[in-house]
Amino acid sequence: MTSSWDCERHGAVHPLHVVARPTVEALAAAGLYKVASTSGVPLWVPLPVLPGWTLTGIATAGDERSAAKATVVAMSGPSPLGGPADLLVIAEEPGVGVGARFAGLDEIDPGPTVAGPPEAKVEAAGHPTALWRSPSADDRAAFVGEAMGVWLWAVLWPPAAELVLLEHVTLHDLRDVAHASL
């Protein structure tokens, strides 16, 4: 008996565990602090939080027998052009496909998207990190790059919310011991 799922087209499918309301109690109950400290991929959080933005969800992909293969942090706040906006910051090992799925792609990895000059930059763990525009569904904008040896995705709704990436976005990995008290 196994808890793994396989797709003929995409291979292994890792279970996605979602913390719907990321209160301190919910995060503790979900064991997220343990996940953050034992995850195989970064748990990226924009710090300081963008003005007017709030944490709205956290998810991990993987099973209880191994470290998380992907992490997702959801944020909501004002779009630079007015109205509400959503941002997903996703870290994943190559071949997992969580970022591509949220971007609205049929593929697992970004493929030839990561070429040429980048269209956005963030700071991840103190390092400038290039992001390239990825194909995406029409109702969102997606960017992808590499940080700490894994894919880093930023998926934003609506597409005009991509202007958020023009701000100085600084991502911190909650696995870092400096963030243990958060």
Question: Which residues make up each language-model segment?
Answer:
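Short, solvent-exposed recognition patches
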Residues: T54-R133
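A short, solvent-exposed beta-edge/loop patch
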Residues: A115-L182
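N-terminal cysteine/histidine-rich coordination modules
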Residues: M1-A36
